[in-house]
Amino acid sequence: MTHIRKSHPLLKIINKSFIDLPTPSNISTWWNFGSLLGACLITQILTGLFLAMHYTPDTMTAFSSMSHICRDVNYGWIIRQLHSNGASIFFLCLYTHIGRNIYYGSYLYSETWNTGIMLLLITMATAFMGYVLPWGQMSFWGATVITNLFSAIPYIGTNLVEWIWGGFSVDKATLNRFFALHFILPFTMIALAGVHLTFLHETGSNNPLGLTSDSDKIPFHPYYTIKDFLGLLILILLLLLLALLSPDMLGDPDNYMPADPLNTPLHIKPEWYFLFAYAILRSVPNKLGGVLALLLSILILGLMPLLHTSKHRSMMLRPLSQVLFWTLTMDLLTLTWIGSQPVEYPYIIIGQMASILYFSIILAFLPIAGVIENYLIK
């Protein structure tokens, strides 16, 4: 008799995706981050749901409602810290996941890669809107500065900004719509993650060697479910350590002051996970140019399948490309540091050089390295 998990209409979908899924036998710990991202998304939705039960999206009461959650609601403080620090862990896993896909050439599964880029953009938009909700100083001014970037669009810019704001400045209407969007977007992310997984299971997983592994596959359960569970335990440990021992380490002290439109903070900056893009934005002296550079810093990932020139899929056996990959990693860390610094010498010039290097590595150096490596292995 066929097992129920193989015959039941719903269970057989789960079975084909998470139990009997044929998986390469040599995938490493770097392949854990997809499941960790799923765990992060579920955690964020659950903690966010409990926060939404007590939060009021109104400019007069938003800040005090956050204070009320932390002081008066049972375990409200830990729910808030898990949610805000969970976002940091989410982006840490997200950037590692993207880095692994670049290193091992998984971007050649273009449908999976493109849905992944869409997920990245939606995640960034959701996180930005979530940062506005506590209605502290950095929330208000961050929202003002970032939404103002749309005014750089020719002809429709000013109208577009006022349409986003729902008025002539960031106010109650803005906060209300940001809360509504911040609440609904994670559910669209679940749907898109389903599409992402469907595309992945059409081709099967890549592996560290970048070779076809059809002849050597093992079932996902129990081998990789145990492996993923260990990763999940480490993730939970990291999140609890961050939320319980140093909950404000990654936040901004200015956000403990209620939003004041008449008092601008000395240095307006977003959360750490947006600092690299913020540094690229600031490195271009022209407003429209900066906005385009900001957009391209993410959308450039979509060009990676087209820029792949090597005969080898993975970078595992390509030393020249490996050097460039780790240079790119350090360049992004440099941009993250620059984004947190004031706009003055020497940070301006370092930011400009790091931005040029970022685009040069992806658009020119990696494709050239691929051609050189092809020549060397002839």
UniProtKB/Swiss-Prot annotation:
Disulfide bonds: none annotated. Keywords: Electron transport, Heme, Iron, Membrane, Metal-binding, Mitochondrion, Mitochondrion inner membrane, Respiratory chain, Transmembrane, Transmembrane helix, Transport, Ubiquinone. Heme b b566 binds at residues 97, 196. GO terms for cellular component: mitochondrial inner membrane; respiratory chain complex III. It holds the Pfam family Cytochrom_B_C. The chain crosses the membrane at residues 33-53, 77-98, 113-133, 178-198, 226-246, 288-308, 320-340, 347-367. One of its GO terms (molecular function) is ubiquinol-cytochrome-c reductase activity. GO terms for biological process: mitochondrial electron transport, ubiquinol to cytochrome c. It is found in: Mitochondrion inner membrane. It is a multi-pass membrane protein. Heme b b562 binds at residues 83, 182. Its cofactor is heme b. Gene3D superfamilies: Cytochrome Bc1 Complex, Chain C (1.20.810.10). Binds 2 heme b groups non-covalently. A ubiquinone binds at residue 201. Belongs to the cytochrome b family. The cytochrome bc1 complex contains 11 subunits: 3 respiratory subunits (MT-CYB, CYC1 and UQCRFS1), 2 core proteins (UQCRC1 and UQCRC2) and 6 low-molecular weight proteins (UQCRH/QCR6, UQCRB/QCR7, UQCRQ/QCR8, UQCR10/QCR9, UQCR11/QCR10 and a cleavage product of UQCRFS1). This cytochrome bc1 complex then forms a dimer. Heme 1 (or BL or b562) is low-potential and absorbs at about 562 nm, and heme 2 (or BH or b566) is high-potential and absorbs at about 566 nm. Component of the ubiquinol-cytochrome c reductase complex (complex III or cytochrome b-c1 complex) that is part of the mitochondrial respiratory chain. The b-c1 complex mediates electron transfer from ubiquinol to cytochrome c. Contributes to the generation of a proton gradient across the mitochondrial membrane that is then used for ATP synthesis. This is Cytochrome b. The lineage of its organism: Eukaryota, Metazoa, Chordata, Craniata, Vertebrata.
